[in-house]
Amino acid sequence: MNITESRLPQDGAIKHLDDGKQLDLRVSSLPTIHGEKIVIRILDYSMSLAGLETLGFTDENYEKVKTALTAPNGIILVTGATGSGKSTTVYSMLQLLNTPQTNIITVEDPVEMKMKGLNQVQVMSEIGLDFNTTLRSILRQDPNVIMIGEIRDDETARIAVRASITGHLVLSTIHTNNSLNTIERLLDMDVERYLLGSALTAIISQRLCKKLCPKCRKSRPTTEYEKNLFKKVLNKDVPAIYDAIGCDECFNGYKGRIALHEVLLLNQDIRDAIINNIKKEELRNLVYDKDNTKTLLEDGLVKIINGSTTIEEVVKVIDLDTDFGENDVEIRNAFLGKELKKDEENFKKEQSEIIDTL
């Protein structure tokens, strides 16, 4: 970062050793009328790279990811919003693939974590070393695995897909909400349907929730709205779930974060559907077939049942516009019932507080 420049937004990084732990600090500055606004993200990869098995995947989803990583070629995409743990998931997958016999090359902006055994390239656009230039050169380096930090534009998407069908396993991230949305986004980026249908191996969509403190969490009976939601989505009768309480270890009832996952392994039916340009709702039905993919909502509800998080946290990260199909009327109503009930309770609470002040 240029310390003499305060008129332009800037990004930078700081390495900090804290009690023997190497922390990466990501700094972002934004010029405002009152001066520079600074945000610092604190990244502790010593904790986050404890292994793929520690990232909160259910047994079923974990096996799907491992199956995808055994493919000799194809493209595996990790999707989600900024700060949803995509990089941690990608690096954890690279850990599994990283052997002396495997030529792994990454192209990143920035290189988020240095790993032994990887050939990591830092993008420097100011001298012409951008994603596309680097990717073309990487293809001449005889790689087994290519990791692209992020698919940001049409050309990068096309190069990544073409690389994956020429004998390379490609890992990357993209800012989309779920599996279906990812397929649509890649098609919007002018990736040819026949190439995408052949190349796409798996899509891992994820979001982060606060994790319940195991010391102070407290069980309580489910409400009628919650029972309805569990029944409609999981077809389960759930008599009780956990609430956040707060103690001297966590202060607010939560300690750490846990990921919600949606893992799609593409089968031949989905590949054919992409190539043949079938209707969106038909593609949705294939993607979210009960025997194929568990949605983010389903994964979230499972983690509520096992006491990992709360229904309030899952409700925060589920998007009604993208996480439900047009035909999921009963599930939408059950989900909305929880939201409406929460609004009603908040209204009554606010009314009570106003009356108390009179």
Where are the regions a protein language model picked out?
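Short, flexible helix-loop junctions that flank or precede catalytic/ligand sites
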Residues: 1-358
